């Protein structure tokens, strides 16, 4: 996590904003009384898209199809990280595809975006993102303060009328400052998520409204925030690239995947009622939305270099992100003679396609390069570490750590001492990943992560 930041209370601003919105509410409710009372609200929830051009057209098509086929009122919720600076085409094209995607969403239904740590990836000044998104008619939320002005980049909450229903949406960010682009960090003052939530959410949520909280703070912070919420709240998580639903009374806590691989549809019958949750998988081979199909093709053709189009490996079958993560952990263990290999979950974006793998596809799968680091532990220490790894299954909320390590093999042969290998980010942040601070890592000379993995794919 990042260092503790100054806590800024936006309660007064939010209350004034909510009061201003309430003044129009009787007219809005009167316009559609039957719909407001008798028809469920549907929230389409997406998060952590990361410029995933191989599926963003299919994701938009899925949203379009869902809304066109269903007369229920909809709200679209994007919980941060639309952009990815690691996508060279996104950087070269100034994210034209993502902005076209946002414009299309705004035409389909009321759309709310909570700012994540990758919103300043392409343009490092967050205020430009806020201005441009608002110009599309999108409601932008954030509890991040612009240090230059001392003012928030956007309101931390908003009241939205959806088919005559009153919906209150709040948004908060991760304060892990090192996950934001380096060029933007000095502009950002980000409160500690739980402290901000404790000070502000009680004044934001309303007993007569559908309450939704968009948190890009991650599982660890969200677990502390959950007890603060009134029963029946929809808490949307992000940042950790997870996909699960946790039920607590009538409150639902959902993570909706990443890299445009899935979306969540939450059906809410009335304020305070438990949302019915449906996860929709996005098929890479499905038709893309006409609003994006040609643009994606032309943008890739224009901006991909010969080097990025070059075939750098082959895969016997398509791999999900979890399969790719385990495969990489196995490869680095084999390369270094380690007993167990470890690599961070969010080091990965997409999985890997079947057959030929272009460098562009490879970079989308393994986002970051780095050194390989080794350490030795005894059997008891390894057993404790392995309990924290491979959290892509059905893991209780209390056991989740947010980001986590893929570890392979999962059951190494029994011995007294074990050699571990991991990527350098995981070693540097060993307390978060390994759950301890006493591992003495040393660098493996002349070996890099991506180089090792490419050797295993050739």
Task: Describe every region a protein language model picked out.
Residues 21, 72, 231-232, 337-338, ...:
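Short, well-ordered coil loops that connect the C-terminus of an alpha-helix to the N-terminus
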Residues 25-28, 217-219, 223, 356-357:
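Short, motif-level signal for alpha-helix interfacial/capping segments enriched in acidic residues
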Residues 39-40, 46, 51, 258-335, ...:
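Catalytic centers of hydrolytic enzymes
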Residues 26, 63, 96, 393-394:
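A short hydrophobic/aromatic micro-motif that marks alpha-helical segments and, especially, helix-coil
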């Amino acid at each position: 996590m990042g260092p503790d930041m100054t806590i800024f209370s936006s309660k007064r601003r939010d209350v004034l904003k909510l009061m201003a919105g309430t003044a129009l509410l009787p007219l809005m409710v009167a316009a559609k009384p039957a719909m407001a009372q008798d028809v469920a609200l549907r929230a389409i929830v997406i998060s952590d898209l990361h410029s995933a051009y191989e599926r963003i057209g299919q994701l938009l098509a899925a949203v379009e199809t869902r809304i066109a086929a269903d007369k229920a009122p909809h709200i679209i919720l994007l919980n941060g990280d639309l952009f990815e600076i690691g996508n060279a085409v996104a950087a070269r094209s100034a994210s034209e595809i993502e902005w076209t995607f946002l414009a299309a969403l705004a035409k389909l239904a009321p759309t709310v975006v909570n700012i994540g740590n990758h919103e300043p990836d392409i343009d490092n000044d967050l205020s430009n993102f806020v201005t441009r998104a608002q110009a599309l008619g999108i409601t932008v939320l954030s509890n991040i303060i612009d240090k230059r002005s001392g003012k928030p980049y956007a309101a931390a909450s908003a009241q939205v009328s959806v088919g005559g229903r009153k919906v209150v949406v709040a948004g908060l960010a991760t304060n892990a400052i090192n996950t934001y682009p380096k060029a933007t960090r000095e502009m950002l003052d980000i409160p500690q998520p739980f402290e901000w939530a404790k000070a502000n959410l009680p004044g934001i949520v309303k007993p007569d409204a559908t309450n939704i909280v968009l948190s890009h703070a991650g599982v660890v912070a969200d677990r502390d925030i959950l007890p603060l919420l009134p029963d029946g709240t929809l808490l949307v998580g992000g940042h950790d690239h997870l996909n699960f639903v946790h039920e607590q009374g009538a409150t639902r806590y959902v993570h909706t995947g990443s890299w445009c691989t899935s979306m969540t549809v939450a059906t809410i019958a009335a304020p305070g009622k438990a949302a019915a949750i449906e996860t929709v998988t996005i098929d890479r081979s499905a038709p893309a939305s006409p609003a994006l199909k040609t643009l994606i093709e032309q943008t890739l053709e224009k901006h991909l270099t010969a080097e990025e189009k070059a075939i750098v490996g082959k895969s016997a079958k398509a791999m999900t992100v979890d399969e790719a993560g385990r495969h990489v952990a196995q490869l680095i263990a084999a390369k270094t003679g380690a007993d167990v290999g470890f690599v961070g979950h969010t080091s990965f974006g997409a999985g890997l396609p079947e057959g030929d793998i272009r460098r562009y596809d490879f970079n989308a799968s393994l986002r970051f390069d780095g050194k390989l680091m080794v350490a030795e532990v005894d059997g008891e220490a390894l057993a404790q570490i392995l309990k924290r790894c491979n959290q892509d299954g059905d893991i209780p909320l209390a056991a989740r750590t947010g980001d986590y390590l893929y570890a392979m093999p999962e059951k190494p042969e029994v011995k007294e001492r074990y050699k571990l290998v991991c990527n350098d980010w995981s070693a540097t942040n060993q307390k978060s990943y390994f759950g301890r601070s006493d591992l003495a890592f040393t660098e493996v000379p002349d070996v890099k992560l991506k180089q090792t993995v490419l050797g295993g794919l050739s």
